[in-house]
């Protein structure tokens, strides 16, 4: 499954210039995190092991210095037959010098004991690397430097099962 951004008109520029959105193709699998791609194409949701990309964020209409940068830290903690993944996504919007953080939790329940050993798990239905989102799946960052545009980072993730 892939998604392509294309050239868009940028009506927000007073001079009526063209907003050139770089073409970015995302080939998705259930085991790969899609990068932020410079804030251009963002994943909107994650279901059944596939990225569902249904929108293209035109951040190039704002000054480059005000585009948020996504820093990702993912940690997985394993319990018998359960993997809990905690993701902290930080979006920094410069020159606003404002940092927005929101933790997101993903739980994978597709594990069952293997050979009666509770500390070893195998996937149910052949899916071992998918963490389904629980609760919110997006982080909204809005600069505090007078720019009214809202940057929305849809921060959903897959994680590797470590149990």
Curated annotation (Swiss-Prot):
GO terms for cellular component: cytosol; keratin filament. One of its GO terms (molecular function) is structural molecule activity. Residues 111-150 are annotated as: 4 X 10 AA approximate repeats. Sequence repeats lie at residues 111-120, 121-130, 131-140, 141-150. The keyword Repeat applies. This is Keratin-associated protein 11-1. Belongs to the PMG family. Keywords: Keratin, Repeat. Expressed in the upper matrix and in the entire hair cortex. In the hair cortex, hair keratin intermediate filaments are embedded in an interfilamentous matrix, consisting of hair keratin-associated proteins (KRTAP), which are essential for the formation of a rigid and resistant hair shaft through their extensive disulfide bond cross-linking with abundant cysteine residues of hair keratins. The matrix proteins include the high-sulfur and high-glycine-tyrosine keratins.
């Amino acid at each position: 499954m892939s998604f392509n951004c294309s050239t868009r008109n940028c009506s927000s520029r007073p001079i009526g210039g063209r907003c050139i959105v770089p073409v970015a193709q995302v080939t998705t699998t259930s085991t790969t995190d899609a990068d932020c791609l410079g804030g251009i194409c963002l994943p909107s949701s994650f279901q059944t092991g596939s990225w569902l990309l249904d929108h293209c964020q035109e951040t190039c209409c704002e000054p480059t210095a005000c585009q948020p940068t996504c820093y990702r830290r993912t940690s997985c903690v394993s319990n018998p037959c359960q993997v809990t993944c905690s993701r902290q996504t930080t979006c920094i919007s410069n020159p606003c010098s404002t940092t927005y953080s929101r933790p997101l939790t993903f739980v994978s329940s597709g594990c069952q004991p293997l050979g009666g050993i509770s500390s070893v798990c195998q996937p149910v239905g052949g899916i071992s690397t998918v963490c389904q989102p629980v609760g919110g799946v997006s982080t909204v960052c809005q600069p505090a430097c007078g720019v009214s545009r809202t940057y929305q980072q849809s921060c959903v993730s897959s994680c590797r099962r470590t149990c």
